[in-house]
Amino acid sequence: MDKNIANAMLLRLNKQDQIEALKSIGFTTVNENTPASDIAKYMQWSGTLLDLSLATLRIEDGEQVFFTASEWNSMSANNRSKYIRIGIRLRAECHQFIIAKSACVDAGGNKTFKWGGYGTDLRGLKNYGSGNQGLYDTFDGKENTDVIIETLAGVKDTQGTVGAPAAEVARAYKACTLESDGIEDTTVWNLPALGELMLMAKYKTEINELITSMFGSQNIFTNDWYWSSTEYDASSSWYVNFSGG
């Protein structure tokens, strides 16, 4: 459905129905006490308006807390010290998810990982060949990552790769640790589905601006290609080239 049509449908609902509709597309904190002005903003985000915010963990209880750039920059150093920055939350086009603050790296500093499973058609992952309907509406990165890791655990593919390196390193990612930051990151990180990657590529410029201001330019998306967790066939998976899609 066209996002503007979906937004118009939301506007015609009464408040309770609006709340339920927003919850169904990821705005889980909305309730009957949410101000009408906030509900109006959420409805815009469910359409075509982009909303980017800083994702943090509150050290006191590990809860995720989100701040706009202006909110974070206006806080005192003492108040900032109560939170650990873990990434950027993206909300747009009826979807929301958190983008990690930095790339995955192994012990040797390597940032490039094989997908694994070459020659294996993974049961539980739909094959999306060229032109498949719904290809760009794939937002099931968590479910895909679960299947990939479980299915390929300890399996050597026909090219000698064991397991699922890209999915495994994504799932093992930690934005903070108890030893270094005073709190352990319990976020379930994933290898994004193609639709999630396409949304990141679409808003790369805006995302990079916020990443630079919060984490430094060394952490921005580069004009490189990034694996998705969406399978093409038994021997190929989709990736997105961030220089052009």
Q: Model regions: which residues?
A:
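Short, compositionally biased
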Residues: M1-D185
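Enriched - but not universal
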Residues: T48, M75, Y118, P192, ...
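Structural recognition of the beta-strand scaffold that forms the well-ordered cores
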Residues: F97-A100, N190-P192, Y226-S228
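Extracellular low-complexity Ser/Thr/Asn/Gly-rich intrinsically disordered segments
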Residues: S130, V162, A166, N190, ...
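Catalytic and binding regions of secreted/periplasmic enzymes and modules that target cell-wall glycans
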Residues: V188-W189, L197
